[in-house]
Amino acid sequence: MDKEKIEQAVSMIIEAIGEDPNREGLLETPQRVARMYEEIFSGLNQDAKTHLSKSFEIVDDNMVIEKDIPFYSMCEHHLLPFWGKVNIAYIPNKRVAGLSKLARTVDVYSKKPQLQERLNIEIADALMEYLNCKGCLVTIEAEHMCMNMRGVKKPGTSTMTSVARGAFEEDLDLKNEAYRLMGL
């Protein structure tokens, strides 16, 4: 990440909106924003394979659900935050991921400029590819600042997305059971 470019750009934005980048309260803002971007866009430098390739052998293939995984991301259209919770259900294929690995996978894909719809797809596809599960269902419920503070200005509006792969695409009863266990 080019922190120097970010600092220059933030300084230019401050100036472009009619503020003084040398004013006491804004003097270190470009550096703060650059450090913040390094943190909130850290998913750009990560690979979910690193997290999901370490798995544990199991005897049966019962459904695994990890729900209410908190996340935040930045809308790629306006660079405004959106945040919420991710639910993941999957059917193992004789191997399970450590529970923290699912949360880390959410971080990999959410910590970059993103669309909620794509975030769903990327998490599901990573589970299928790197965990080699028989199927997965990923749901996201999120609130978007681009809906709250600009445009239509509808605070409190929730956006729900859902992606099914493998067994969850093929078996509606399985999909409905996962939704029920997720509380949806």
Curated annotation (Swiss-Prot):
One of its GO terms (biological process) is tetrahydrobiopterin biosynthetic process. Pathway: Cofactor biosynthesis; 7,8-dihydroneopterin triphosphate biosynthesis; 7,8-dihydroneopterin triphosphate from GTP: step 1/1. It catalyses: GTP + H2O = 7,8-dihydroneopterin 3'-triphosphate + formate + H(+). PROSITE patterns: GTP_CYCLOHYDROL_1_1, GTP_CYCLOHYDROL_1_2. Its EC number is 3.5.4.16. Zn(2+) binds at residues 75, 78, 146. It is an enzyme of class 3 (hydrolase). One of its GO terms (molecular function) is GTP binding. Transmembrane segments: none annotated. The keyword Zinc applies. Keywords: GTP-binding, Hydrolase, Metal-binding, Nucleotide-binding, One-carbon metabolism, Zinc. One of its GO terms (cellular component) is cytoplasm. InterPro entries: GTP-CH-I_C/QueF, GTP-CH-I_N, GTP_CycHdrlase_I, GTP_CycHdrlase_I_CS, GTP_CycHdrlase_I_dom. Belongs to the GTP cyclohydrolase I family. HAMAP family: FolE. Homomer. PANTHER family: GTP CYCLOHYDROLASE 1, GTP CYCLOHYDROLASE I. This is GTP cyclohydrolase 1. The lineage of its organism: Bacteria, Bacillati, Bacillota, Tissierellia, Tissierellales. The gene is folE.
